Curated annotation (Swiss-Prot):
Signal peptide: none annotated. GO terms for cellular component: cytoplasm; DUBm complex; nuclear periphery; nuclear pore; nucleoplasm; SAGA complex; transcription export complex 2. It comes from Drosophila ananassae. Keywords: Activator, Chromatin regulator, Cytoplasm, mRNA transport, Nucleus, Protein transport, Transcription, Transcription regulation, Translocation, Transport. Pfam families: EnY2 (PF10163). GO terms for molecular function: C2H2 zinc finger domain binding; chromatin insulator sequence binding; TFIID-class transcription factor complex binding; transcription coactivator activity. It is found in: Nucleus, Nucleoplasm; Cytoplasm. This is Enhancer of yellow 2 transcription factor. The keyword Repressor does not apply. The gene is e(y)2. Involved in mRNA export coupled transcription activation by association with both the AMEX and the SAGA complexes. The SAGA complex is a multiprotein complex that activates transcription by remodeling chromatin and mediating histone acetylation and deubiquitination. Within the SAGA complex, participates in a subcomplex that specifically deubiquitinates histone H2B. The SAGA complex is recruited to specific gene promoters by activators, where it is required for transcription. Required for nuclear receptor-mediated transactivation.
Amino acid sequence: MTVSNTVDQYTVLSGDRSKIKDLLCNRLTECGWRDEVRLLCRTILLEKGTGNSFTVEQLITEVTPKARTLVPDAVKKELLMKIRTILTENESEIEDAEEP
């Protein structure tokens, strides 16, 4: 199991995943990322979606890499710090529980 999978599993089990997702959604909205991605989708659809042959899957495949690069570094850092805090708190709780 990778570190990423372990963190993902822990956050799901502890209930912190929804808090992290809420924080991410709020920050992406606040910084205008969602609007940028919406415009990117609209632009791609206008360029390639003249017929009905352009599928949602194709749009997602094209938009995802560009959208990921648009996420501000400050948002990435904040989420990373939040995850580290959650894991550190968990580690402290485990150590406290193990002490006699």
